[in-house]
């Protein structure tokens, strides 16, 4: 009987784990619209963290940077080098703020899933998680990137920008048009899938072995989250550079 009862308890435990829900959402009703409140709340927190950190770090700038100012200048230099490499020496300047904002928002959003105690905030439906854990956020970021590289191409070449769709031959017109749809799709689903999978793996491991085992996985998740932010920012800059250069 003890063996049977133990087996039943084990099955019940796995049943509870399988009940982890990823589709429950908390909405605010504003007029005739439903607003996805979870994403807004966590996104506002991430934005507040970024603005607060930047304000504190540079509130008393020094000629020889130290501490927070030194870190901010290092990040700025990293983003500037990344943007210059992908867009080019002559055109990269105006795009540093955009690429830097994308990189930092995605990085802090990804890390917030592991470093911020979202679970202690109870909602009527669903639960708070990293903003990039939601497909709405990643699609919005990808669409912003699409708007950016269309704007970059049109600002540089005018209507001649659309000539790229028939290069090197008009036969490739459908494929070149399709490419503009696949870019935001790949950007959004790559980021969403990686962050969601990471948080689900950690949640399951914490349910199974709540002490030591999840810690290395969490550190691995922080590393992969940083890589995903870097990949997104690099591809965004590459697409913008490509639209201004007019070649693939």
From Swiss-Prot:
Gene3D superfamilies: ATP synthase, F0 complex, subunit A. Keywords: ATP synthesis, CF(0), Chloroplast, Hydrogen ion transport, Ion transport, Membrane, Plastid, Thylakoid, Transmembrane, Transmembrane helix, Transport. It comes from the Eukaryota. It is found in: Plastid, Chloroplast thylakoid membrane. Pfam families: ATP-synt_A. The chain crosses the membrane at residues 38-58, 96-116, 135-155, 200-220, 221-241. GO terms for molecular function: proton-transporting ATP synthase activity, rotational mechanism. The keyword Transport applies. Key component of the proton channel; it plays a direct role in the translocation of protons across the membrane. NCBIfam families: ATP_synt_6_or_A. Belongs to the ATPase A chain family. F-type ATPases have 2 components, CF(1) - the catalytic core - and CF(0) - the membrane proton channel. CF(1) has five subunits: alpha(3), beta(3), gamma(1), delta(1), epsilon(1). CF(0) has four main subunits: a, b, b' and c. This is ATP synthase subunit a, chloroplastic. It comes from Cycas taitungensis.
């Amino acid at each position: 009987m003890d063996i049977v009862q133990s087996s039943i308890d084990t099955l019940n435990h796995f049943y509870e784990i399988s009940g982890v829900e990823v589709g429950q959402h908390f909405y605010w009703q504003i007029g005739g619209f439903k607003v996805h409140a979870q994403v807004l709340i966590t996104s506002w927190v991430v934005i507040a963290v970024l603005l607060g950190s930047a304000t504190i770090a540079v509130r008393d700038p020094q000629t020889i940077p130290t501490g927070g100012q030194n870190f901010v200048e290092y990040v700025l230099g990293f983003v500037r080098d990344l943007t210059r490499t992908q867009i080019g020496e002559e055109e990269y300047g105006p795009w540093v703020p955009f690429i830097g904002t994308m990189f930092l928002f995605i990085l802090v959003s990804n890390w917030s899933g592991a470093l911020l105690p979202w679970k202690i905030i109870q909602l009527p439906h669903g639960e708070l998680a990293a903003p990039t854990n939601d497909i709405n956020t990643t699609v919005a970021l990808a669409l912003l990137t699409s708007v950016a590289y269309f704007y970059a191409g049109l600002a540089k070449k005018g209507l001649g920008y659309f000539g790229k769709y028939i290069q090197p031959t008009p036969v490739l017109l459908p494929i070149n048009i399709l490419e503009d749809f696949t870019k935001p799709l790949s950007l959004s689903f790559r980021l969403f899938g990686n962050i969601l999978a990471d948080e689900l793996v950690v949640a399951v491991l914490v349910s199974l072995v709540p002490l030591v085992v999840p810690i290395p996985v969490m550190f691995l998740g922080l590393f992969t989250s940083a890589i995903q932010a870097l990949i997104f920012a690099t591809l965004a800059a590459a697409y913008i550079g490509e639209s201004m250069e007019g070649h693939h």
